[in-house]
Amino acid sequence: IDEAYADFASHNSISLLSKYDNLIITRTLSKSYSLAGLRVGYALASPALVSVLDQAREVYNVDRLAQAGALAALSDRSYFETTKTQIIKLREELRIEFDHMGWRTIPSGANFLFTQPSRQGDSGPDTAADLYEFLFDREILVRYFPQNQLTESYLRISIGKPAEMGILMDRIKEWQTQEKRK
């Protein structure tokens, strides 16, 4: 089970470890600990399964810089908890804002929202593309997935710092008041 975003969710799968000997839960420090560039993670499993995984592990599987970053991040639990709580709070505030604007937003247990923007009654692929381009032109980067019919009307918006989220909302409100682009 991939639990890359488990720290932002209300539930996790750890209790399943005692029920299933063949279960492996993987986690990363990339998301909630903000160590994406260091590629540090870990696995949770039964002792027998950990032994098998350990036999396949490479000798130098985590470099010294990544080890130092991970140790520093893991040793400051207070900062982690404060940051995690802030991200969850900002995510919920943003979701509520989107709800008030009539956007469809998928429930999230991660550090991002997957939302279908709407403007002047239109919430199709052209609307998502238009907002994506509008934000990009203002150096605000969100993810857009036009290659799939299921996702072409949605944007994935990562949760940043409070000031960044304020700027994002200001730009979205500015976009909503503009005429549709041709």
Cite the ranges covered by each PLM segment.
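PLP-dependent aminotransferase class I/II
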Residues: 22-99, 103-106
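Conserved PLP-binding catalytic core of the aspartate aminotransferase-like
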Residues: 87-88, 98-138
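Short loop segments at secondary-structure junctions
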Residues: 45-49, 76, 117-121, 162-163
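PLP-dependent enzyme catalytic core of the Aspartate aminotransferase-like
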Residues: 134-138, 143, 147-182
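Short acidic/glycine-enriched loop/turn segments that link adjacent beta-strands
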Residues: 37, 109, 149-153
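Active-site pre-lysine segment of PLP-dependent enzymes
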Residues: 3-32
